[in-house]
Amino acid sequence: MSVALEQKQGLIAGDGLLPVKMAQYAKENGFDVVCISFSKDNLSQLKKYCSKVYSCHPGEINRIEQILKDEEIKQATFLGKVNKSVLLKLYKFDSRAIEILKSVKRLNDDEVMLLIVREFEKLGICVLDQTIFIKNLMIPAGVLGKHKPTEAQMEDVNYGFWLAKEMGKVDVGQS
């Protein structure tokens, strides 16, 4: 699926270097990045590449929605890790967050993320594929070492890939 990119991009940033790299690449390619950061770890780095950086807790839904509306964000990318220990600080959840979470059947990562995407869509915001602005960091498809895997080894790789995706769906530990 190809999507026409807006000049102004929203970035919902968790911990780590990926949100910073996304903002850097986007800025270098003429995009204006407005960031809502859930992390204090990379805040100073994000400020180098984003025109605005708002520090929020994931449970401040009313504030996040207002920022997105005020900034006229039409497209957003989620990048970076948000620890469940941060997410589960219930005292930081506003009434809108509690209302949204009540509609979740299970609090696994996939279900919560799909719910967030649907909420963004209700606001008229398209959640973009995470790889759009970081393709330059991705390993190309194909053989990476000196030896091409045998057919049996490729079957193992494909099975492992399928299994990791299935484990992610049911929220079983590190997949």
Feature map (PLM): residue ranges:
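Conserved active-site and cofactor/substrate-binding residues in soluble primary-metabolism enzymes
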Residues: A13, L17-K21, C56-R63, L107, ...
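N-terminal beta-loop-helix "entrance" segment that forms/cooperates
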Residues: F38-P58
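Short gly/pro/ser/thr-enriched loop/turn and capping motifs at secondary-structure boundaries
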Residues: P19, K40-S44, I61-R63, K84-S85
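N-terminal basic/disordered segments at the start of proteins
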Residues: V3-F38
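N-terminal glycine-rich phosphate/adenylate-binding segment common to multiple enzyme folds
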Residues: I64-I132
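Short coil/turn connectors at secondary-structure junctions
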Residues: L5-K8, N29-D32, C50, E71-K74, ...
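Internal active-site segments that recognize and position negatively charged phosphoryl groups
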Residues: I116-D129, L137-S175
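Glycine-rich loop at the start of a catalytic domain that most often binds anionic cofactors/ligands
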Residues: Y25, K47-K52, K89-D94
